[in-house]
Structure formats: C-alpha cells, structure tokens
Swiss-Prot record:
GO terms for cellular component: axon; dendrite; extracellular space; synaptic vesicle. The gene is NGF. Keywords: Cleavage on pair of basic residues, Disulfide bond, Endosome, Glycoprotein, Growth factor, Metalloenzyme inhibitor, Metalloprotease inhibitor, Protease inhibitor, Secreted, Signal. It is found in: Secreted; Endosome lumen. GO terms for molecular function: growth factor activity; metalloendopeptidase inhibitor activity; nerve growth factor receptor binding. It comes from Mastomys natalensis (African soft-furred rat). Homodimer. The homodimer interacts with a single NTRK1 chain. The homodimer interacts with a single NGFR chain. The NGF dimer interacts with a single SORCS2 chain (via extracellular domain). The NGF precursor (proNGF) binds to a receptor complex formed by SORT1 and NGFR, which leads to NGF endocytosis. Both mature NGF and the immature NGF precursor (proNGF) interact with SORCS2 and with the heterodimer formed by SORCS2 and NGFR (via extracellular domains). The NGF precursor (proNGF) has much higher affinity for SORCS2 than mature NGF. Belongs to the NGF-beta family. SMART domains: NGF (SM00140). This is Beta-nerve growth factor. Nerve growth factor is important for the development and maintenance of the sympathetic and sensory nervous systems. Extracellular ligand for the NTRK1 and NGFR receptors, activates cellular signaling cascades through those receptor tyrosine kinase to regulate neuronal proliferation, differentiation and survival. Inhibits metalloproteinase dependent proteolysis of platelet glycoprotein VI. GO terms for biological process: cell surface receptor protein tyrosine kinase signaling pathway; modulation of chemical synaptic transmission; negative regulation of neuron apoptotic process; nerve development; nerve growth factor signaling pathway; neuron projection morphogenesis.
Length: 241
C-alpha cells in the first residue's frame, strides 16, 4: 500500500510540473523574450534561496546618496500585478534612445516587469517612409535619477534608487516620454487648421508601480511619470460682423 501511495504521489508531481504555463496578462500576438526571463528567473531563484536560509535579512538600499537597510522580500519581484513595461531594474544603464521604447533590453542582470515583446521602431519605420508626421514631437528616455515622485493620492514620495540583491546593485529606471516642444510649428500642433482651432502640445501622465521608501521600509506604490505627448484643441470663437 505504501509503495502504491508513493507511486501515485510521484505521478501527480510529474503531471503538475509538465502542465503548460499560461499567462493571461500577455496581449494577443505578443511573445516572451525567453533569454531575458531565463536570466531573470535565475537571479530571483538565487535571491529566494538566500532569503529562505536567512529569514528577515535586510536588503541594502541607497537613497539620495546614503546607505540604508530597507527590508524587502525578493518574492515581490515575481508578482504579475506589479509589472510595468516602463519600469526596469538593471545592474547597468539600459540603451539610451530618444525615439524608441526598447523593451527587449536583455543585458545580464536585468529585472523588468514587462512580459511582452514589441518591435523596435527606427528611421525605416513605415510611418517615415509614407511621409506621415506626428502632430506633436516627443522624446523618450530612460530616467535613472528619479528621487521623488507624486503618488496616486497626490502625496510626494521618495523613490528607491537602488537595491542590492546577491551583492549586485540593481538600479530602478523609468521609461518616460514627454513633449519636445509645446508648439512644433508656429501655429501650434502640426497639421491643425489654425483658422478654426487653437492648439498646443502637452505631456500626459500615467501611474506605474514603483519601489519607494517610507519610514525605513520599502513598498510598492503607484507613482506618476510622463508617458505621452498629445495635442490639445480648442475651437476658436467665430468672428462677429
């Protein structure tokens, strides 16, 4: 009886491990960069093993030039709901590009919350080939020196700049997009009929989950970052007489 019991348990465990993994958060048509997530999984698994062997071990964090011990559970990095394609933890600066959101950065020692794969735009993108233009000009960069931000409640919070995992310093980066200029052309937004419309370009924001600090504790909070440049229109008052 005991031999049959152990045989059934072994078969059950093999079946669970062989079950295909699905991710309902993945948009249709998007694929996962396997090389990137293999490296990420290795780093996280190593951190989890050390965390289990040394319970409540603090992770060193450097905030505004000072070293402080911030208690962080490495398992937080594995929660899907915290992932954002605009937040990146990396041991080295990501590629700097003013025209692209390079979400496929796969350098060693990178923790990105993004699980999607997007094609990189370049000067050969069809938009440029067809002679199409954007109504507003934008610039996109990875920001790695953010120290404070506004959270979703309107309060100013301290952004955690770096965390130390397995003696490797991971820096927190944010991919931000903002307007290059308020008025790309003299009349306002490009391509807008200035006879009937007033227009100007403005930077819009969204909220992403970021690692912040409060009272010597690290916590995830929604903070506001720049994410797009849009055109604002107002109709001109008709002339009288």
């Amino acid at each position: 009886m005991s031999m049959l019991f152990y045989t059934l348990i072994t078969a059950l465990l093999i079946g669970v491990q062989a079950e295909p993994y699905t991710d309902s958060n993945l948009p249709e048509g998007d694929s996962v960069p396997e090389a990137h997530w293999t490296k990420l999984q290795h780093s996280l698994d190593t951190a989890l093993r050390r965390a289990r062997s040394a319970p409540a071990a603090p992770i060193a964090a450097r905030v505004t030039g000072q070293t402080r011990n911030i208690t962080v559970d490495p398992r937080l990095f594995k929660k899907r709901k915290l992932r954002s394609p605009r937040v990146l933890f990396s041991t080295q600066p990501p590629p700097t590009s003013s025209d692209t959101l390079d979400l496929d950065f796969q350098a060693h020692g990178t923790i990105s919350f993004n699980r999607t794969h997007r094609s990189k735009r370049s000067s050969t993108h069809p938009v440029f080939q067809m002679g199409e233009f954007s109504v507003c000009d934008s610039v996109s960069v990875w920001v790695g020196d953010k120290t404070t931000a506004t959270d979703i409640k309107g309060n100013e919070v301290t952004v955690l700049g770096e965390v130390n995992i397995n003696n490797s310093v991971f820096k927190q980066y944010f991919f931000e997009t903002k307007c290059r200029a308020r008025n790309p052309v003299e009349s306002g937004c490009r391509g807008i009929d200035s006879k009937h419309w007033n227009s100007y370009c403005t930077t819009t924001h969204t909220f992403v989950k970021a690692l912040t600090t409060d009272d010597r504790q690290a916590a995830w909070r929604f903070i506001r970052i720049d994410t797009a440049c849009v055109c604002v229109l107002t109709r001109k008052a008709p002339r009288r007489g």
